[in-house]
Each structure stands twice: as C-alpha cells, then as structure tokens.
Amino acid sequence: MPSITKQIMSGAKWTSISTMCITIIQIVQFALLGNMMTLTEFGLVGMITTVTVFAQIVLDMGFGAALIQRDDATERQLSTLYWLNIMTGVLLFVLLYVSSPVIAGFYQREELVFLVRILAIMFLIAPIGQQYQYMLQKQLHFNTLSKIEIFSNVLSFGYLAIAVFMMDAILAYVISQVLLQSSKGILYWAVYRKKWHPAFVFDLRGMKDFFSFGAFQLSSRLVNRLGANIDMILIGRFIGAEALGIYNLAYQIVTIPVLKINPIVTRVAFPIFAKNKYENSVIREGFLNMTKMLALVSFPLLIGLVSVSDAFITAVFGEKWLAAVPILNVLAIVGILRVLMNPNGSVLLAKGRADLAFYWDSGVLLLYGLSLFAAVQTGSLLTVAWVYAIISVVNFLIGRWLLAYVIKLNLSAYFQSIMKPFLITAAMGIIAFGVSLSTEHFSMQAEMRLAISVAAGALCYLFLLVKAYPQTKSKLLRKGRLS
C-alpha cells in the first residue's frame, strides 16, 4: 500500500470511529425531530442551519486551512491568529444579535429573531478552542479529536432528547446546537492548553501571508456554501417554511454521507497532501485511492436509499413526510456528486491554490443562483430539485477538468476508479428495489419492508464486493483468524 494511503488509512481509522458514532446519534436525532416537529418547524431548522453554516465559515476566516498548510508559522503569528478568532467570535455574536430582525424579515418568520439570538451565544464560547482544533489536526492527533467530537455530540443529544419533551422542539434544537459547539471549543482548549497557549501579542503586520491565503479560502468557502445553500435560502424566501421543511428533510437525508462519511478521509487527507504538496504523483495516487474508498462506502448508502425511499420515510419519519420521497430520489444525484467532489478542496488547498477554488466556486455560484431563482418561481419543489441536480452535473465536470489542470489527473484513470463501485452498487440497488416492490403485495408494516429490502441489498453488495475485489475476502479471513 502506498505510504500516503497508509497515512490516510491510519488517520481515517480514528475519524471513522468518531463519524460512525456521530452519524448514528444524528440519525436518531433527525428521526426524533421529524416525528416531534411540524413541517413548518422543520423548515425553521433549515433556516437556522443556513445561518449557522455561514457564521461558522466567517469565524474560521480561512485561517484554519492556512495554519495546516503552512510549515513556518511563528509563535507571534499563532498568538495573533488566536486573538483574532476570539474577536471575530464576539463580533459575530453582536452582528447576529443585531441583525436577527433582518434575517426574520427576509424569511417572513418572526420567531427567528429570538432563535437566532440564542444561537449567537455559541460564538462567544466556541472560538476559545478553534485554533487548538486545527493544531491537533495538523499534528494528526485524530484520536483526541474523535473523542472530543463523540463526547460533545452525546452531550448535545442527551440534552435534546430530554428538552424536546419539556419545551418547544425548535428551541430545544437551537440550545442543543449551542451546547454542541461550545463544549467542543472548551474541550479542544482543555486538552491542548498545556502544549501551547497564546502570548498577549497582536501583530497584524506579520500576518500578510495568512491574510493572502485566508482571504481566498474564506471567500471560496463562503461562495461554496452560498452555492450549496442557495436552494434552501430561495425556497424559504419564495415558497415558504412548510415547503422548506419537506425539502430540508430530503436534503438532510441525502447529505448525511457527504457531511459525515467524507470527512473520514478528507479531513485526514488535507494535512497529508499538504506535506506532499510538491509531489503531484503522490497526491494523484492518494486522491484516486481516496475516491475509490469514498465511492465504496457512499454509493451503496445513497443508491440503496433511493431503492427503499418510500419504506424508509414511512418507517422512520411517518406518512406525513411522504411528499419528501420524490425530492429525495432526485437529490440523491446531488449527494453522489457531492461525495465525488468533496476531496477536490483538499487537493487545491494542499497545493496552495485557494485562489482557483474561489474563482471556480464564484462561477458555479452564479450558475446555481440564476438557475435556482428561475426554478423557485414555478413553486414546484421537484422542479427545484431537478435543476439543482443538473447544475451539479455541470459543476462535477468542471471539477474534473480543474484537477486535471492542477495535479495532471488522468480523467480515464479517475473514472476507472469509480466505475467498479458504481456498477456493484447499481446491481445492489436493482435487487433492493425489486425486493421492496415485491413486499408491497403483502400486508407488511413499513418497518418490515424496509428491513427485508435492506438485508437483501446488503447481502447482494457484500457478495459482489468480494467478487469484484478478491483481496477483500482474504483480508476479512485473515482478520477472522487473528481474532
């Protein structure tokens, strides 16, 4: 196994443990909220999530990636970065508190004023540990990062599971998010403060290189997130909270693999790629292996989900959410493409090309914005979903060309790396869909239909996986003997 792939796999082991635990927690949380909330309340969750995403990007300011990418940061620069994070957090709290009526007015939902102000509290606490998080990541301490994230998510969910029965579900959710981000910040600070603590220094003149890289990274991430959330923003503004609730449910389901499974590899890959930034051949090799791993894990989840979408929605969220099924099926295309595009950022940042990422994201944002603005005027969520999927295909193709330019990635080799996982998964999806369709003729509960279909699909996938990758069988047998 190539050295860079070994490093990625080693870090991914700890990150995968964390991600699996967090994903299970969030799926249970998601199901709990789906059953406790109305469609409109779930739409408010989408609005609040959008505000949180943009505020967290601004809090980072692109300096996190700059810190990981650079090998020559001085103590003076590190201290300045730390205090800059603290000041940015305070500024964000004030801005969100003051602008909450504007946000509520945009979405035409008065209740957002109070909710956004509660949410803003996290930006007073989380920044104290943010830089420590990046330093842990840079030094590849993924075991420590994983333990902190698991504990914080368990704490947040434990609170939500109790509070949701004692107060408005939407308020309980917002407070749980404040608790989640704040506890992570405090714990990052607690575990690393003995190794490093900031001096009382604030020297902006020595931060030129950080500002240069960070400005492009911040702009790129803001533009990227705006492009990724423009559908939510426009649906909430022009179609309404109830429609956004339906769309948000479908969107959150298909993006769980993107947001939770991809970082198992990509979070580890960036610092490792950065250490090999002058070796294009090494990055290409690591990138192709990373892409194949992501495809083997994410494809069966997303395509399998489409195969059993009606039974899944009914069993987990209830019949009131069945309107989300056709939206989910279309957005699965977006989810698959996001899985494949997600590693691009690790490569561009490792190569120090935050500028290219910004220009790319800006062009795509314009395309997304104009197309989705036209789509929401129809008032049809399905139209919005299809437009989003088509533009995502265009974005995906642009991304492949960009990687060919930056690291001389051979497109034929790239598509070969994902073709086998796709064909295996497609066969699994057909089997699972056929079983799901067959069980409809029997008087079965949705839960039983779902269980039978998933079991059939999983067995089919494992069988085809061993046939397609014989080395997988030998590894499993070897581990079985060792245990």
Curated annotation (Swiss-Prot):
The induction annotation reads: By phosphate starvation, via the PhoP/PhoR two-component regulatory system.
Q: Which GO biological process annotations does it have?
A: cell wall organization; teichuronic acid biosynthetic process
Q: What is its main location?
A: membrane
Keyword line: Cell membrane, Cell wall biogenesis/degradation, Membrane, Stress response, Transmembrane, Transmembrane helix
Which residues span the membrane?
15-34, 41-63, 83-105, 112-134, 154-176, 294-316, 321-343, 356-378, 382-404, 411-433, 448-470
The way it spans or sits in the membrane comes to: Multi-pass membrane protein
Q: Which Pfam families match?
A: Polysacc_synt (PF01943)
One GO cellular component assignment for this chain's record is: plasma membrane
The reply to whether Membrane figures as a keyword in the UniProt entry is: yes
In terms of superkingdom, the source organism counts as: Bacteria
Q: Which family is this protein grouped under?
A: Belongs to the polysaccharide synthase family.
Recite the other comments. The nature of the anionic polymer present in the cell wall of B.subtilis depends on phosphate availability. Under phosphate-replete growth conditions teichoic acids are present, whereas under phosphate-depleted conditions, at least part of the wall teichoic acid is replaced with teichuronic acid, a non-phosphate containing anionic polymer. The synthesis of teichuronic acid is accompanied by degradation of teichoic acid and reutilization of liberated phosphate for other cellular processes such as nucleic acid synthesis.
Q: What does this protein do?
A: Might be involved in the translocation of teichuronic acid repeating units from the inner to the outer surface of the membrane.
PANTHER family recorded for this chain?
Answer: LIPOPOLYSACCHARIDE BIOSYNTHESIS PROTEIN WZXC, PST FAMILY PREDICTED COLANIC ACID TRANSPORTER
Protein's name in the database: Teichuronic acid biosynthesis protein TuaB
